[in-house]
Amino acid sequence: MAISDSVSPEPQQLLCLTITAFRKPGMSEAAYREYMTKTHAPLVSGLMEEYGIVRYNMTHNNSKSRPLLFQLYDPEFSKLSDYDCIVQFVFRRMEDFLRMKSDPRFLEKVAPDHQKFADTSRSTMTIGYFEEFLENGKVVPK
């Protein structure tokens, strides 16, 4: 079987866009989390639902949570990450996410909102295929 350079997902396979996000310089951790969860997330969540985005979540990595990692310390995985938050979007098709990003409401309200809290010059992104093995404490049958 030949290996192809173009990789396309299986019809039911979900995509996951992951952003390792940094807060705007001068913004406190508390203000960043408050803004992201109470202002930005509500601003974009309805639009995501409208365009069929399956999942949108944040994991905040701050000065209270970072030291917890030392309780899990393992020499194999010992490097601490310094980002402030991981943001993940799970969706069925690229077209769904792209249509949402081209919606006038996204362009007029959501996109400019990032300047209020995010240091996009430091943030990184990746996209891959989402697969879940444990959900609500139960093994997901494969």
Swiss-Prot record:
- What triggers its expression? Highly expressed during conidiation. A conserved conidiation regulatory pathway containing BrlA, AbaA and WetA regulates expression. During conidiation BlrA up-regulates AbaA, which in turn controls WetA. Moreover, the Hog1 MAPK regulates fungal conidiation by controlling the conidiation regulatory pathway, and that all three pigmentation genes Pks1, EthD and Mlac1 exercise feedback regulation of conidiation.
Indicate the enzyme's highest-level EC class: oxidoreductase
Which InterPro entries does this UniProt record tie to the protein? Dimeric_a/b-barrel, EthD_dom
Q: What is its EC number?
A: 1.-.-.-
- Disruption phenotype annotation: Leads to the production of dark red conidia. Does not affect virulence.
Q: Which UniProt keywords apply?
A: Monooxygenase, Oxidoreductase
Pathway assigned to this chain's UniProt record = Pigment biosynthesis
Task: Quote the SUPFAM superfamilies the UniProt record gives.
Answer: Dimeric alpha+beta barrel
Zinc recorded as keyword:
no
Write down the Pfam families for this protein, in alphabetical order.
EthD (PF07110)
- Which family would the database say this protein is a member of? Belongs to the tpcK family.
Q: What is the stated purpose of this protein?
A: Dehydratase; part of the Pks1 gene cluster that mediates the biosynthesis of an anthraquinone derivative pigment that contributes to conidial pigmentation that provides protection from UV radiation, heat and cold stress. The polyketide synthase Pks1 produces 1-acetyl-2,4,6,8-tetrahydroxy-9,10-anthraquinone though condensation of acetyl-CoA with malonyl-CoA. The dehydratase EthD and the laccase Mlac1 further convert the anthraquinone derivative into the final conidial pigment.
- Put simply, this protein is called Conidial pigment biosynthesis dehydratase EthD
The species is Metarhizium robertsii (strain ARSEF 23 / ATCC MYA-3075)
